[in-house]
Amino acid sequence: FSDMFKEYNQNRPSGNKESIWVMQLEYNTPGGGGAYEDWSKRAWVPKYWDETGFTLCDSLGGRGLAQIVPFQWWIESTDFFDATDIRNSEANIKRHWYYNNPETPELLGKPAEMTELTRSKCTLYPAVTKFFYGKTEDDPSYGGNNKDRMKFRLAETYLLLAEARIQQNNAAGAAEAINVVRRRANASEITASQATLDFLLDERIRELVGEELRRLTLVRTGKLVERTRKYNPYSKEIDEHNTLWPIPQTIIDSNTGADFPQNPGYN
């Protein structure tokens, strides 16, 4: 699984048989994108470098800003992944951090402890490694992510197929599609009775975290409000009308020749 996200492995000529559409990014190349075309590394990599005993390093993901921190309910759960699921391995979710700054020799090489404080500071926490690297070996402080980025890949097509079959009340067919993905991940297969919409949404986290546009998935499946209230402690006040965004007033005002009402709940 982790091989798909290693630098230079995203394209089919490199042997990646799961990629469907890959954004082509080339470091220091005209037309290859700059530091801001793909912000995923800055968003997903912890600010470990801001913790005493650490220094910027390509193998730790470079200069992350930790703008997106995974919720503890899944990434620190003991039963969210099967014990054999490779998507939960250290290669894919970094849970062990070791001090690497030679200027603090008393700490160098020792394990760093993840605590509620390091999580609240966004410095040390279990981190998704999909967005590590990306030309950071040239300059660990480089803010961009010029690693080619997969936008569509085969696993998601199977999960979309499973979603469609669930909506058709074809649980056996949904389980069959989900199991294609789980077999590749060395996870146990599921039965038709387990192929629910909630299981599918959990499977999309296991497979596609950081890749899918999660809000769109939850809106499409009618689960935005329910799962936000259940799993996001900071957004318990979400309401059904929040399924839609408010329409900017400038857009409403520009439609002078037609009635253009605001979405419900925002008047």
Ranges and model annotations:
Residues 59-153:
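Flexible, polar/acidic helix-loop-strand segments at domain edges
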Residues 123-137, 176-179, 183-186, 205:
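Charged alpha-helical initiation segments
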